[in-house]
Amino acid sequence: MDSRNFLIVGGSSGVGLEIVNELKSQRDEIYVGSRTSDKLAGLERVHHLKLDVKEPPEHLEGLPDVLHGFVYCPGTIRLKPFQRLTRDDFLEDLQVNFLGAVHVIQACLPNLKKSPTGASILLFSTVAVTTGMPFHASIAGAKGAVEGLTRSLAAELAPRIRVNAIAPSLTDTPLAAGLLSSEEKRQAAAERHPMKRIGSAQDIARLALFLLSDDAGWITGQVFHADGGMNALRTFK
């Protein structure tokens, strides 16, 4: 199989870094857009592009002419009572989770359209969009916009470009460190899920790898719940 080119925004930590490592094992060329690159040092076929999604450029310098896939990983976890959320809280969550994705997709869409075999866009939502949870108003609103964007773009860009999203529950990554800072918190979080464990970065990355692959060539406009059963199941003991 010929080498492919992927852009992973937010690929320097957490789920994004795990996706980078999975793609790297397939000998693909990977372009990582992020603010930091410490964890990317020495990785073969991994190219770093300095990028802050709060201030995205109109043009992304350093990308190859053709992209076969794009993944947007940046996210926020801002859990507050609704009355304590400020306008700036809502705006920042929208900027990082939704508008950042919009800007980067617009910048790299010409590269994706040049893929001779079609391309794939993968975004990230959250289980909190479809499962109402207290203190999630801001992030659920921002990720709800991501789900709407996923379906709208999938319709607009078909059949050449597929667009899907993954909606995880709590995953063991640096972003969630504050929610998993003690063994008691980890156990309580695990118990809330029907599968009785917290998600791992690898759980999410392997689903992402499938959705980026030709094996998922008939899948578009979908939101996949990788959430330990939280969205769909109620286990009564």
Regions flagged by a language model, labelled:
Residues 81-82, 86-94, 189:
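Substrate-binding pocket helix/loop in short-chain dehydrogenase/reductase
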Residues 85, 132-140, 152, 237:
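Active-site loop-to-helix junction immediately N-terminal to the catalytic Tyr of the SDR YXXXK motif
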Residues 105, 142, 150:
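Active-site helix of classical SDR
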Residues 110, 154-159:
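Alpha-helical segment proximal to the catalytic Tyr-Lys
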